[in-house]
């Protein structure tokens, strides 16, 4: 479990330390998609073709896998705390992967009221919940004192659209999906192969008809003139 608190706004580390892995996991949950097109394009992406399945199997740079040749279950979960209402809600996705699967066939997005359970989605034997096991947890949370949010969040969703509607409307408080994705993408370092200047233009300033960089430069110049007077 990794903790990100209110004032954490920088996620950094050495190359290969796993920054992209964490950000990709967050993006899967926020976008409701397991498509490789949503994953972070890292500097070494030509050598390491990322996919959610390769992540789940624990792909290593030498081509080996931590979970090769075995059936397993796994979850990616975000625990969200509303500082206004003091309500915690969890959103995520659960997977069941077969040892011979060449793509992800069985998975479901879910949400539930309250914090991550004390067992951290593990059975008494230390095995991650199956989708059926997760369904039981969600059903229990319906009658729990934790269920005090704005709407019905204790659900396993039949579609990506149903999941995202609950996440953006009920849990996040009517966030516009397109803007959410644009801003979140702008917060993630993708490629810097064209130099720092082009990277800043592409990913730190939203595209518009106006020359945003020139406008900001003019404003900074005017500010310096005022300061020097």
Residue ranges of model-derived segments:
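Extended, Lys/Glu-rich alpha-helical coiled-coil stalks
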Residues: 127-229
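Extreme N-terminal "head/tail" segments of very large remodeling/mechanoenzyme assemblies
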Residues: 1-138
């Amino acid at each position: 479990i990794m903790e990100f608190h209110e004032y954490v706004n920088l996620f950094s580390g050495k190359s290969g330390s796993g920054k992209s892995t964490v950000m990709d996991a967050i993006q899967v949950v926020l976008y409701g998609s397991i498509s490789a097109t949503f994953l972070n394009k890292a500097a070494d992406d030509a050598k390491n073709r990322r996919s959610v399945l390769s992540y789940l199997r624990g792909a290593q740079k030498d081509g080996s896998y931590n979970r090769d040749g075995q059936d397993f279950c796994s979850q990616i979960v975000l625990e969200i705390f509303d500082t206004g209402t003091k309500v915690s809600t969890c959103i995520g996705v659960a997977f069941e992967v077969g040892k011979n699967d060449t793509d992800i066939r069985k998975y479901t997005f879910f949400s539930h009221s309250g914090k991550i359970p004390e067992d951290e989605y593990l059975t008494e034997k230390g095995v991650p919940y199956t989708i059926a096991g997760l369904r039981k947890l969600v059903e229990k949370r319906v009658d729990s004192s934790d269920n005090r949010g704005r709407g019905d969040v204790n659900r396993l969703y039949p579609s990506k659209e149903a999941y995202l509607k609950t996440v953006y409307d009920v849990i996040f408080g009517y966030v516009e999906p397109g803007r959410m994705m644009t801003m979140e993408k702008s917060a993630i370092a993708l490629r810097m192969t064209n130099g720092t200047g082009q990277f800043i233009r592409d990913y730190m300033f939203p595209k518009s008809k106006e020359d945003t960089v020139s406008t900001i430069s003019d404003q900074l110049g005017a500010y310096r003139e005022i300061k020097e007077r």
